[in-house]
A protein has these predicted regions:
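Structured mid-to-C-terminal alpha-helical surface segments
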Residues: 1-125
Length: 125
């Protein structure tokens, strides 16, 4: 471990990570109990948004959907986002997530879901 050599570590690029999170958000809709996915999209885009390449993210999203056998139309995505943003249970889950994860701070559910929705519109629709 302390040798003088290089160790290669293979990781996903940011676009693939985002694509998988976004696909999960859309696929699960209001049945998604993992509001962490929303926080992850929010955080990644907040920190690395300028580095995200739209065509790479779009292709990664398409490949993720194909691999998971879940194809969505623009209308599907918009309808799901509307349902999620209006769902009171999702807001409650966010409150629980917020209380148990100090790093979330006072970040409100509405801010997160609006940000995620705008990100999807900008990059995928």
């Amino acid at each position: 471990m302390f040798e003088d050599r290089t160790i290669s570590v293979f990781t996903y690029n940011k676009e693939t990570l985002l694509a998988e999170k976004v696909q999960t958000i859309i696929n699960r809709g209001i049945a998604n109990t993992r509001v962490r996915d929303f926080y992850d999209v929010y955080s990644i885009m907040n920190f690395y948004g300028e580095q995200i390449e739209k065509p790479v993210l779009y292709d990664a999203f398409s490949a993720t959907c194909e691999k998971r056998k879940a194809i969505f139309t623009k209308d599907d995505i918009e309808a799901t986002l509307h349902l999620v943003s209006a769902d009171l249970h999702m807001a409650e889950l966010w409150g629980q997530f917020q209380k148990s994860n100090f790093y979330v701070g006072d970040l409100e559910w509405k801010s997160v879901i609006d940000y995620v929705e705008n990100t999807m519109k900008k990059y995928l629709l």
